[in-house]
């Protein structure tokens, strides 16, 4: 049972395309869902510092995976960014 319709649409597309749950796209997708869930949780519970730390860790993992994908395959990276509606990280 999926609570969020956005999650179900993207996960169905991922399942139709490939069964590989270890792919970079699927990992970024699952991290994005965790980030959105933790963000809404932290909106209610502002002093939950362990969840804040967990959110920062997941954000870092997603950032590293996106950097890897942008180096390896820029087309798949752009498509994933557009599909998940997340911003590109700032370049230094």
From Swiss-Prot:
Q: Does the keyword Ribosomal protein apply?
A: yes
Q: Does the keyword Ion transport apply?
A: no
For this protein, the record's HAMAP family field holds: Ribosomal_uS15_B
Protein family? Belongs to the universal ribosomal protein uS15 family.
Q: Which UniProt keywords apply?
A: Chloroplast, Plastid, Ribonucleoprotein, Ribosomal protein
One of its GO biological process terms is: translation
Molecular function GO terms recorded: structural constituent of ribosome
SUPFAM superfamilies hit by this protein = S15/NS1 RNA-binding domain (SSF47060)
Designated name of the protein: Small ribosomal subunit protein uS15c
**Which PROSITE patterns does UniProt cross-reference here?**
RIBOSOMAL_S15 (PS00362)
Q: Where does the UniProt annotation locate this protein?
A: Plastid, Chloroplast
One of the record's GO cellular component terms:
ribonucleoprotein complex
Subunit-structure text = Part of the 30S ribosomal subunit.
Organism of origin:
Lemna minor
Q: Give the principal location in a single coarse category.
A: plastid
